[in-house]
């Protein structure tokens, strides 16, 4: 076995509902607000597309040609610039596997998505983690840490778990400082939720920065977390390399047709994003708003030096959230879900 695996833990998504009920001695139904999922589900067109599939005895299209064609038209990029994977986790793994070797290091932030670090360590690569500044990526400090050993720079924008973002001015200024041999991966898993005018569109920056890789997903805003479909958009040269480490038939037939159907129903997406925006704003109008980091996504981050206590209070209030070292991340749910959250947080800080 690889010796570096000895120090790695197994990723845990949290306890099951039944395990939580036993541990905290609670009954009833939970609001599942731990994984930033879409609480209302995908477009009805997705279910129709999936029900129409009856050739499940055959392997899916290994090249995801139809989905790539749909994404190509949607973003006005060449289909050869697109890589499709079983969620962004697989895309992150492919990029890391293709690019990293023991002689280099990655740059990322301490308080961000853990898979960037996990796959660097699996590839025996050094990880240089830079603290967040006011809950967001500190790109100025990234500049100070870049050197000839830097292989990949990972930027989560908006950031998970804080929900903050770097502006277009901040991002383009940073990209201009990065050597063209260094990959910059811009993880935009939550970009659909951002309604701020100064938020950068990563795909629009690809022509200026050929070393940029943009990641997006159908798991969050489109509500297809159970189907696992993510994708990267970048230069054809990068895609050609990533395809060499891609597993054959990596995305299921049902996932492919579901993603195509979801992409077509943009009105459904807009309606859900509007719902999310309305519900998110209510959190930042609450009496406890000083304990929140300003989020532009489908989740909030509650700052507290007692995250386990808040997590337990939420469980006893019928809400499953995600505890972190310095707070708790809570997905924005339905109106009823969010009322539960408001009640618990108000009580916790009163």
From Swiss-Prot:
Q: In which pathway does it act?
A: Amino-acid biosynthesis; L-histidine biosynthesis; L-histidine from 5-phospho-alpha-D-ribose 1-diphosphate: step 7/9
Q: Mind telling me which InterPro entries this protein's record contains? A: Aminotrans_II_pyridoxalP_BS, Aminotransferase_I/II_large, HisP_aminotrans, HistidinolP_aminotransfase, PyrdxlP-dep_Trfase, PyrdxlP-dep_Trfase_major, PyrdxlP-dep_Trfase_small
Reactions catalysed according to its record: L-histidinol phosphate + 2-oxoglutarate = 3-(imidazol-4-yl)-2-oxopropyl phosphate + L-glutamate
* Gene Ontology molecular function: any one: pyridoxal phosphate binding
Statement: the UniProt record of this protein carries the keyword rRNA processing: no
UniProt keyword list: Amino-acid biosynthesis, Aminotransferase, Histidine biosynthesis, Pyridoxal phosphate, Transferase
Concerning Gene3D superfamilies, the annotation shows: Aspartate Aminotransferase, domain 1, Type I PLP-dependent aspartate aminotransferase-like (Major domain)
Cofactor(s) of this protein: pyridoxal 5'-phosphate
Which top-level enzyme class is recorded in the Swiss-Prot or TrEMBL entry?
transferase
Positions of post-translational N6-(pyridoxal phosphate)lysine modification = 220
Q: What are the recorded Gene Ontology BP terms?
A: L-histidine biosynthetic process
Please, which domain of life does this record's source organism belong to? Bacteria
Subunit arrangement? Homodimer.
Q: What family does this chain come from, according to its entry? A: Belongs to the class-II pyridoxal-phosphate-dependent aminotransferase family. Histidinol-phosphate aminotransferase subfamily.
PANTHER family the record matches:
HISTIDINOL-PHOSPHATE AMINOTRANSFERASE (PTHR43643:SF3), HISTIDINOL-PHOSPHATE AMINOTRANSFERASE 2 (PTHR43643)
Supply the name of the protein.
Histidinol-phosphate aminotransferase
């Amino acid at each position: 076995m690889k010796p570096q695996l000895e120090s790695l833990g197994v990723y845990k998504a949290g306890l099951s509902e039944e395990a939580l009920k036993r541990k905290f001695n609670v009954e009833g139904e939970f609001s599942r607000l731990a994984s930033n999922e879409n609480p209302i589900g995908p477009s009805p067109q997705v279910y129709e597309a999936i029900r129409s599939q009856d050739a499940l005895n055959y392997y899916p299209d290994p090249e995801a040609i139809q989905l790539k064609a749909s994404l190509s038209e949607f973003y006005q990029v060449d289909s050869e610039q697109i890589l499709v994977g079983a969620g962004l986790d697989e895309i992150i793994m492919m990029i890391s596997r293709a690019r990293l070797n023991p002689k280099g290091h990655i740059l990322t932030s301490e308080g961000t998505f853990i898979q960037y670090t996990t796959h660097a360590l699996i590839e025996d690569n050094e990880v240089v983690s830079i603290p967040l500044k006011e809950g967001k990526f500190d790109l100025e400090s990234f500049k100070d840490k870049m050197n000839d050993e830097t292989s990949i720079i990972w930027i989560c924008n908006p950031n998970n778990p804080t929900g903050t973002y770097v502006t277009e001015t901040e991002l383009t200024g940073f990209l201009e400082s990065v050597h063209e041999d260094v990959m910059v991966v811009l993880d935009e898993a939550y970009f659909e939720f951002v309604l701020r005018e100064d938020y950068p569109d990563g795909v629009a920056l690809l022509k200026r920065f050929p070393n940029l890789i943009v990641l997006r997903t159908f798991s969050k805003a489109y509500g297809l977390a159970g189907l696992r479909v993510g994708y990267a958009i970048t230069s054809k040269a990068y895609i050609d390399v990533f395809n060499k480490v891609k597993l054959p038939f990596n995305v299921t037939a049902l996932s492919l047709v579901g993603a195509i159907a979801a992409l077509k129903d943009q009105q459904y997406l807009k309606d859900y994003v509007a719902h999310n925006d309305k519900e998110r704003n209510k959190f930042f109008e609450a009496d406890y708003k000083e304990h929140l980091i300003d989020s532009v996504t489908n989740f909030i981050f509650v700052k507290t030096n007692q995250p386990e206590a808040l997590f337990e209070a939420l469980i006893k209030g019928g809400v499953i959230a995600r505890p972190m070292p310095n707070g708790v991340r809570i997905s924005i749910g339905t109106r009823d879900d969010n009322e539960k959250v408001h009640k618990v947080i108000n009580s916790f800080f009163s």
